């Protein structure tokens, strides 16, 4: 059997009036509707409470208050940020075309940046060609370099120890010096007019002169 609930009267409270205004009359109390009697002994029976249907009978609403208009200065910040114009819906082909144009612009920008970088590297690596006379005057001549080299070699020969006659007692540097001297002497002999006239006579004179020099060194 269902629960029996107490019925509470639902009555609107009297309106609050300022002092001095007398109430037009006593507020009539709402008549409580009679509850329908639930059948006795019915399993799963429910109690139904009927509420007064005319609850907004005394409510007064001005029709002008229902009409509202959204002005531009009264818009919210969100609506202003979004913009008044709605976004146009583009077809798929137009979207792909716009995306392709954006990609082409990005690729072109990357190419321009790389080209500028290459040109800058070229300018840095390029040698400035101008008047070479001051540079040529500042550099020493080849003859002066050769003369200085010969003087250095002569000083080394004077300061160094006397070279032994036997090859077995010579060092590697001394052997190289001996070979260089012999090569120079042989080239001078080939370039001399005496060798062109009589090679055997020129070679004999050169050997005799060399033997005299070596004999004088030994003495």
UniProtKB/Swiss-Prot annotation:
Ranges in coiled-coil conformation: none
Region (Disordered): 1-43
Keywords carried by this UniProt record: Nucleus, Phosphoprotein
Pfam families recorded: SLX9
Chief localisation class: nucleus
Modified residues (Phosphoserine): 38, 192
Compartmental location: Nucleus, Nucleolus
Signal peptide (UniProt feature, chain positions): none
One GO-annotated biological process of the protein: maturation of SSU-rRNA from tricistronic rRNA transcript (SSU-rRNA, 5.8S rRNA, LSU-rRNA)
GO CC field: 90S preribosome; nucleolus; preribosome, small subunit precursor
Amino acid composition bias (Basic residues), ranges on this chain: 1-15
Role played: May be involved in ribosome biogenesis.
Similarity remark: Belongs to the SLX9 family.
Protein name: Ribosome biogenesis protein SLX9 homolog
Annotated source species: Mus musculus (Mouse)
């Amino acid at each position: 059997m269902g629960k029996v609930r107490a019925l509470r009267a639902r009555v609107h409270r009297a309106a609050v009036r300022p002092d001095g205004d007398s109430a037009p009359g006593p507020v009539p109390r709402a008549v409580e509707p009679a509850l329908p009697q639930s059948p006795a002994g019915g399993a799963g029976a429910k109690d139904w409470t009927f509420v007064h249907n005319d609850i907004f009978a005394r409510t007064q609403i001005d029709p002008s208050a229902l009409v509202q208009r959204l002005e531009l200065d009264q818009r919210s910040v969100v609506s202003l940020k979004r913009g008044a114009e709605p976004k146009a819906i583009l077809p798929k082909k137009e979207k792909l075309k716009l995306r392709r144009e954006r990609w082409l612009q990005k690729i072109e920008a990357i190419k321009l940046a790389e080209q500028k970088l290459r040109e800058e590297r070229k300018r840095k690596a390029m040698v400035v060609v101008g008047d070479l006379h001051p540079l040529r005057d500042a550099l020493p001549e080849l003859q002066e370099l050769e003369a200085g080299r010969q003087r250095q070699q002569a000083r080394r020969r004077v300061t160094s120890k006397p070279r032994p006659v036997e090859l077995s007692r010579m060092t590697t540097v001394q052997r190289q010096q001996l070979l260089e001297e012999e090569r120079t002497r042989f080239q001078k002999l080939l370039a001399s007019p005496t060798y062109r006239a009589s090679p055997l006579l020129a070679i004999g004179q050169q050997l005799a002169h060399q033997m005299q020099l070596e004999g004088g060194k030994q003495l």
